Amino acid sequence: MLLLGFYRSGSWILDPNGAPILTDFTPMWLAGREALAGHAAAAYDSRHFGEIQTEFVGPHAGQYPWPYPPIFFLPAAVVALLPYAWAFLAWQAATLAGCLAAGYRILRDGLTPLAILAAPLSLLNAYVGQNGFLTAALIGAGLSFLERWPIIAGICFGCLFYKSQFLLLFPLLFAIAGHWRALAATVAVGALLAIASSLAFGVEPWVAFPPALTERAQAALVVQDLAWGKLQSVYGLARALGLGALPAGIVHAILALLVAALACLIWRRRGSFDVKAAAAASAALIVTPYLFAYDMAAIVIPGAFLVKDLIERGGTRREHAAIFGLFCGLFAMFAGAGIVPLGAIVNLLLFSLIARRAFRGPAPSPAV
């Protein structure tokens, strides 16, 4: 209803005159149009792509880059077949459906979709037209299929190559736990997607992508072409607190390595798979320095696995209170989006709760 109100007021997708509004979805749709026109590599030319955006949304709207690998031209080209507004709605509806399905598969509770919809970062992702729902769907589905259907899990994680910063930890965890079929499927699907994108759009995008990615990383992580409050990683928090690029990078690297090491230890131990899945999904959001508010929509996945374990094995009142507090923290993060990167703190607190449960085991609540 809130999004409908934004749309009717001319502040979402289209302005009051029916012209497109610049959102994070705009570069995806325009990149898809470039790919359909036969020159996908042009999307990595920041000057050319900026001119296209200016022509599409006007000179005063600003510009967004196209930082995704060439495999992401595949879905971009599909949505670009639709008119802009319909493409926006179709993309959000399809990826949200995947996210809701993944959440339901984890908890098997009819209230799960409602909880995901109630999460404030779901509204943020839908408003800006981003791909946080897709990231959540792939991680959630991949982990939920891992034990019984490892090939399907590998397919999900192979598709996550579109945002490889969230994939970094999973192959290592799969190797540690002996999920070799899932690991092989992940690599195979990634390779097949690369081949498919090359056949569809040529090899030129693969040549243009590395320098474009370097340029974007330099702009986002060093030059600061955006407010540090939008970067929800430990690195973003350190920069927001006044640290320079090098010391912030060191702080992030130390915490990322610590979290990765703990996740590996959790996956080496015998114990609840739900706790292991929660640890992996949570750690994936912490180890990358490149994490924006809309990416935090994926926090529902570690939360769902943790809640499932609390339901099945019991938990203390403190654990239940902590979960509720973290959920409230997401609202605080939503209110402070772009000002203070509270997402880093929420992620670290959630992982701490998961790790505590992994190493100490469940402690049932006292009987009432």
What spans do the regions from the language model cover?
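Aromatic-enriched
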Residues: 308-368
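Short alpha-helical segments used as structural interaction elements across diverse proteins
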Residues: 127, 160, 249, 353-354
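Membrane-embedded alpha-helical segments of transport systems
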Residues: 162-165, 192-197, 319-322
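Membrane-interface alpha helices of multi-pass inner-membrane proteins
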Residues: 151-164, 168-175, 280-287, 327-331
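Primarily membrane-embedded glycan-assembly and transfer machineries that use lipid-linked glycans
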Residues: 1-152, 174-300, 304-311, 365-368
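Helix-centric, low-specificity signal for extended rod-like, repetitive segments
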Residues: 156, 245, 349-350
